[in-house]
Structure formats: structure tokens, C-alpha cells
Amino acid sequence: MSKSSHTYVLLSLAFIIVNLLTLNHLRPWIDEVMMLDTAYNAAFHGRWETTAWYRVVGQYPFPTYPPLYQMLAAAWMRLFGSSLVAVRSINLLLTFLLGGACLRMMKRQGLALSVWATVLFTLLLWGTGEMAWMYRNGRPDMLCALLVATAILAARRYLASESPSTRIAVIAASAALACSGLQAVVYLCALWSFCFIAHRERRKPYIRLLVLMLTGFSLGIPSVALFMLAHGRLVAFASSIVQYSATLSSLALTVVPWAGDVLGFDAAPYTQKLLQLTTKMSLGQRLLSIAAYRSFLILAAITLAAYISCYRNSLRLLLSDAGFLMWLFALCTPIVMVLAGRFPVYYHWMAFLPLLLSVTLMAVRSRVWCAVFCVAAFTMSAFGIRSMLPDGQGDYSRLQSFIGRQAFKKSDVVVCPFSVFYEIKPLCDTCYFAGIFPTEYISHADYIIEAPDGDAYDQPVTDYLNKLKADSTLTITAIDTCENPSLTLYQVKKKHE
């Protein structure tokens, strides 16, 4: 193993240890519970179902996200348990593998990475606030990023040597990518388009590469569709794709009412959901929201200055430099994603990773700029440490103690906020996360856990509690409370019991 590889492994292990000690500083949130509730039920109850999802096109809630991450998480839970630290640590492993794939990508470029360039790369990968937030929660974004890196490595091998094995690798990587998240498919297609434009002299190999990628997508996406069809949720799956893309939503709002008139079905439930989820922000406002990604913009500005200083006498050489092209793609990515749909914080890896590669390539070339980037990386890591500090939403150990001292039975039905997910799931087989799950599907509840000082996603639990309080046949009794975080446990009983 080379010095640079040793450096990456040792620094990454240090970050992993720090993260394992601080993962509970970020309380469970809506996306995390939505993704992992299905995985938990599959791992410990053998059922692919959830009580932490929303109703789609009038059907009972069902997880309509491509299932690869949930399947991986279910296997992980079976092996390592379902505690917060155990489950979230899967993303630490995926991030470590992602970094290794990126380093391999650069070595395939013929680069001899210095120790300091590797330190720079590792600090920016693990230490920046946006990346730390992404790998510290239970979303599937690190899996998507890793599979994108894997697909790029497979594509580079294919472009270097077109053989049956490299063709199969591209198809397999593309199929797996489609099963991990359709946003990653859009991203890989955008990257291919950028490379196709940038490498005009190699357009025929790139066209053949596109055919292989599309073959992989045509295997992966139908596999997901068949999975949804087997569970009777194909229409819900298609609807969930449309409703989270601004472009497809606008098109659907035009096409669906027309299709309803022609085919004779009620289009109102579909259009109502689309209107509910369609962003109220204009395209200009969505583009301006990119400015909130400050660390990315600052690092991009420093990187641009570095490349201009190295190529100030030759624009042609600048535009043909691989590192500068990565910088350009990183800058284009937020714009493309906004035009395609949206660019929330958990998609920021799409812009950050090509920028990280661009920075590292420049650091290898210039010791002066390597020093400048290292100063920036240490500064950004110092600010990034804040994401590892308590999130200000309460002491998680208090929450653990609060849930642990209750006498719940496996058969109890509990309505609760997302924050108690990891603690309540092992205790009760039926837990409704009413922050998103429609309460009309809850036939009864034995206990309700309210978070009075919670966020907007905790309010539906309070609304459900107030609804039961208004029922004259029920007795609602507060039996325990917790402070920091603020939680109240209510027992629900029929008056004749």
C-alpha cells in the first residue's frame, strides 16, 4: 500500500471514530425514518411495508423509493443491530469506499498523489459541513454517490479497452445505479452529456458507452418497476417520480386532466397531489438558492483562481485541462439539477465531488496551490466540526432513558414523532409516525408520544392527540414527560376499560 493510501486510511479512520462517538448528536428526522422504517420491518418482521410514508394517489402508504438502499440497510440491521449508531454507520462505510473509488479514479488518470494532496482530499471529503451532514444521517445519498463513482470507473475502463468484461461492468454499474435512486441516473446522464461535448474527438466511443449505460438503465428501472408492480404500487411509483420533478410535474398537470377526459377516470386526486407538492418558487428563485451553498462557492472561486493562474496565457489549454473541466461540471451541476427538478442539500454531493477531484488535481500540480487549498480545507473542516456537535434539539441520552423506562408491550400501538424511531421500534411492533403517515389509517392507539416543542412534522401527532381528546369514549392520560427534548407520553383507553 502506498503512502497516500496509508494516509487516506488513517485519516478516514480518525474521522470514522469521531463520527461514531457523535452520531447521536443529530436526532432522527423525516427522510431518515421514511427510508429506514421499511428496512427495519423487512429485517425483523419479514414484511416490506411501512408506517412512515405518505399516501400516494389515494392508496395506503407504501415506500415508492427505489429499494436498493432499503435492502442493503435491512441486511446491515440483521448483522449489526438497529441502534442509531449501528444503522447510521453504514453511511460511514459507504463514504470510506466512495473516497477510495475517487482516489482510484485519479490514479487511473496517471496521477501520483502526494501525502499532502491526499490529506487535502480526505479533509474535504470528511470534514466539510455539507458532506458531514450527508453521511451522518440515514438517507441513501452516499450509496448513490458510490455507485456513480463505480459507474465512472467502469466507463473509464471501457473507454480504455472495449472488451466483453468492460461492457458487462458498465451495464451492471448502470443497472445498480438505477436501483439506488433515479436522481443518480439523471446525474450520470448529465455527466455523459458534458463529456460528450468536451471530448469531440472521441464521440463514437462515447456513443457506444451511452448505449451500454442505457442498456443498464433499461434493466435497472424496469426491475424497480416490476418490484413496485408486484406490491401493487406501480402507479404510485410513477406518480412519486413525477411529483418531485418540477419539469415532469408541469407536464403532468397538463397531460393528466386531458388523459382523464379521454380515458374516463377521475384526475382530481392526481392533480391535487401534484399541486400540493409543486414548488411555489420561481425558476429564478430556485437558481438563487444555490448561493446558500457557501463553502462550495468559496472553494470553487479559489479553484478557478488556481486554474486561471496556471493557464493565464493559454485559454485553449485551460479548456482542455481535465481538472478545469471537472470544475466546470461541478459548477453546472446545481443549475442542471434545478432545471430538472430541485437541488436540496442532500444532492450537494453531486456538485462537491467533481469539485473535490478538481481541487486535488491542482494540488498535485502546484505546491503553492496545494498549500492554499490545505489552509482552506483545515478552515472548512474547523467549521464543519459544528455539524458533529449537538444539534440543539435535545440530549439524545435523555430520550433513550425516557423511552427505556416505559413498560411498553410488543403488541402496543404507538403514535409517535420521528425522533424516537430508533428507540421505539424494537419495543413495539406497530409504530405510526404520524408526521407523514395519514392518521385516517390508524384504527386505534394505545399510546401517543407528543413532542410539544417539535417542528412542523411533529404537529400532526399533536393534532391526532387533540382529535382523540375530543372523543368522549376515550380517556387520555399523561403518564410521563421528558425535558430537553420535550416529550410527553399519553396512554389511551376506552372509558369502560
Regions picked out by a protein language model, each given a short descriptive name:
Residues 208-276, 292-299:
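Membrane-lumen/periplasm interface segments of specific transmembrane helices
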Residues 2-4, 107-115, 162-163, 199-211, ...:
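Membrane-interface helix-loop-helix junctions at transmembrane boundaries of multi-pass membrane enzymes
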Residues 122, 149, 166-182, 218-219, ...:
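Membrane-interface alpha helices of multi-pass inner-membrane proteins
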Residues 141-147, 186, 324, 331-367:
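Hydrophobic/aromatic-rich transmembrane helices and adjacent perimembrane loops
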Residues 67-71, 79-97, 134, 138, ...:
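Loop-to-helix entry region of an early transmembrane alpha helix in multi-pass inner-membrane enzymes
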Residues 17-20, 35-61, 68-71:
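Extracytosolic helix-loop segments that constitute the early lumenal/periplasmic catalytic or substrate-binding loops
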Residues 29, 133-143, 344:
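Short acidic/glycine- and proline-prone juxtamembrane loop motifs at membrane-interface regions
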Residues 23, 389-396, 404-456, 481, ...:
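Short periplasmic/luminal acceptor-recognition loop of GT-C membrane glycosyltransferases, typified by
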